Amino acid sequence: MAVTFKDVARLAGVSTQTVSRVTNGADNVAEATRKRVNDAIKKLGYVPNKGAQMLSRAKSRIIGIVSLDISLHGVALIANGIRNQAHEMGYGTALTVLANNSIDEFRDAIRELIAQQVDAIIINAPVNQGIAKCLIEQFSQLTLVFIDVPEGTPVNHVRCDHHTGANLAVLHLIEQKRDSFVCISGPSESTASKIRYDAWQTQLQKHGAKEIACYEGDWQAASGHRAIKDLVLKGIDFDAVLVANDQMALGVLCALSEAGINVPKTVSVIGFDGIQDSQYFSPPLTTIKQDFDRLGRKAVKLMLNQMDKPGEIISEVLPVNLVIRQSTSEKTDSSYSKQEVLACLENIRRLLP
């Protein structure tokens, strides 16, 4: 149920006329009273009439975007797809970037966009089911479209087929006779990362492959680098690395190179995203490609369709595909681990006089 003037007035302990004066920016309100009203508005998630009337009387033709840090390649490419599609359809865009994934941060971001009188909002950030439902209920006057929510969440959303992509990655490495896997996932709050990791686990178990180690990364290259450096320092042997995005895979390749481990002869590495730069990694990265631009564009089309003809909840899943490059190859009997080489050298030393 939508929050009303009366709800705000009741919580703040003032009249509805006072609430009206505060929301209209009138000067003849005591600061203590103004603070109580604004605190009540914030707590209840109330949208002042001025914004609500603007939304109902005439469209501003502005689409709001709530986003993660746009220094992340995937996030930035999705936002770019949203902007491009919006502009082609005669809409402007307004962007706000989250400091974290808390419910309060999402609420503040949405209120900031409402203040700019946006027509609807696309949430370009991971949201759990509870927060998604809360936002839909609290901001019921707005059309919200999500991009990273758990499967089965009753909200409008668009996503790529993370499950199929993760399956393709494991099967590709299994076909290359790899059997000792390291998994580097994304942040635990990301639904996309969880789907990928769960699919990896299912396929590894199905084919009898070993998960040697698992690390949780943060989508940045440095976290992939740290994971591999830790494994090398511990002397742990592995022959394949599944990475939840291409940026972390860049860090993986760098760490393996620093350790003198050959890719793909000794260790095969596969990423996820298919960002354009991945073809220029050393070696060029095998990856699961998802179309970020199309994802952003689809979100805009779904949103506008729901604005014009609100009805049943829509969920769209976009396909992905495997792009094979030089970071993966078939394991051969001539490949040796670091531990095997050290053992061989030790045996030779013992035979010497």
Residues covered by each model-derived region:
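An alpha-beta-alpha
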Residues: 169-209, 213-214, 314-330
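Flexible loop/turn connectors
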Residues: 232-353
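Hydrophobic alpha-helical segments within soluble ligand-binding/sensing domains
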Residues: 156-183, 201, 221-230, 249, ...
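Flexible loop/hinge segments that line or gate small-molecule binding clefts
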Residues: 123-168, 247, 273-285
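Hydrophobic alpha-helical
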Residues: 120-121, 126-133, 182, 194-276, ...
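N-terminal helix-turn-helix DNA-binding module of bacterial transcription factors
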Residues: 1-60, 350-353
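Amphipathic helical "hinge" segments at domain boundaries
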Residues: 47-112, 117-120, 198
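Short, solvent-exposed amphipathic alpha-helices that sit
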Residues: 36, 73-91, 165-169, 191-210, ...
